[in-house]
From Swiss-Prot:
Family classification: Belongs to the phosphoglycerate mutase family. BPG-dependent PGAM subfamily.
Organism placement in taxonomy: Bacteria, Pseudomonadati, Pseudomonadota, Alphaproteobacteria, Hyphomicrobiales
Pfam families in alphabetical order: His_Phos_1 (PF00300)
Subunit structure: Homodimer.
Keyword Mitochondrion attached: no
NCBIfam families: pgm_1 (TIGR01258), PRK01295.1 (NF002339)
Coiled-coil intervals, chain numbering: none
Name of the gene encoding the protein in the UniProt record: gpmA
Organism name: Methylorubrum populi (strain ATCC BAA-705 / NCIMB 13946 / BJ001) (Methylobacterium populi)
Protein name: 2,3-bisphosphoglycerate-dependent phosphoglycerate mutase
Gene Ontology biological-process annotations: gluconeogenesis; glycolytic process
Involved pathway(s): Carbohydrate degradation; glycolysis; pyruvate from D-glyceraldehyde 3-phosphate: step 3/5
Length: 212
């Protein structure tokens, strides 16, 4: 039985390009972000991948990435379930601020702690621990059972909601997760064992040009 789980962070958004804290704000994808999503779909198709169901967040950048991936794979219209449990972490008072401006206001060390620590939230926002507290129950109760039943599952979401999942899948600690970056538009392909642990993991090489 194939137990396939593919995680994909959305393509570059307009606020990624401007280096703004985004969180639950809802900017569109850039042209590069659209290209990243399409490229991910082409790569997955080239690997012979097909999906039975897709999950995404309530935010457009993830929803559009999901749709573009599926379109490139010839699976437009696939069952796609949206849920705010998969939303990006809420950056609270940092939302909409330029990251360099935030460093000038609060200092490099404080902003780094808010961005990379496991359990220190920015003012009015969520820590990675808080994000995991909504992502992981949704994964365990809703997504994982479908993977374990043999369905091939795509999850198109966000850097921090996916970091929470990767932390569990890869057995990372609250310290090692601090250094993990999930690139935009790069699929993480997991195959799971019968006990729900990881059998294999494949990551698209971001330097591969799928048009050549």
């Amino acid at each position: 039985m194939e137990r396939l789980l593919v995680l994909a962070r959305h393509g570059q958004s307009e606020w990624n390009l401007k280096k703004l804290f985004t969180g639950w704000r809802d900017p569109e994808l850039t042209e590069l972000g659209i290209d990243e999503a399409r490229r991910a779909g082409r790569w997955l198709k080239s690997q012979g991948t097909q999906f039975d169901v897709a999950f995404t967040s309530n935010l457009r950048r993830a929803q559009n990435t999901c749709a573009l991936i599926l379109e490139e794979m010839g699976q437009a219209g696939l069952e796609t379930i949206r849920n705010e449990a998969l939303n990006e972490r809420d950056y609270g008072d940092l939302s909409g601020l330029n990251k360099d401006d935030a460093r000038e206001r609060w200092g490099d060390a404080q902003v780094h702690e808010w961005r990379r620590s496991y359990d220190v939230p920015p003012p009015g926002g969520e820590s990675l621990k808080d994000t995991a507290a909504r992502v992981l129950p949704y994964y365990i109760q809703t997504i994982l059972p479908r993977v374990m039943s043999g369905e091939r599952v795509l999850v198109a979401a966000h850097g921090n909601s996916l970091r929470a999942l990767v932390m569990v899948l890869d057995g990372m600690t609250t310290k090692t997760i601090a250094s993990l970056e999930i690139a935009t538009g790069i699929p993480l392909v997991y195959r799971l064992k019968a006990d729900t642990t990881v059998e294999s993991k494949t990551v698209l090489d971001k330097d591969i040009d799928q048009d050549n």
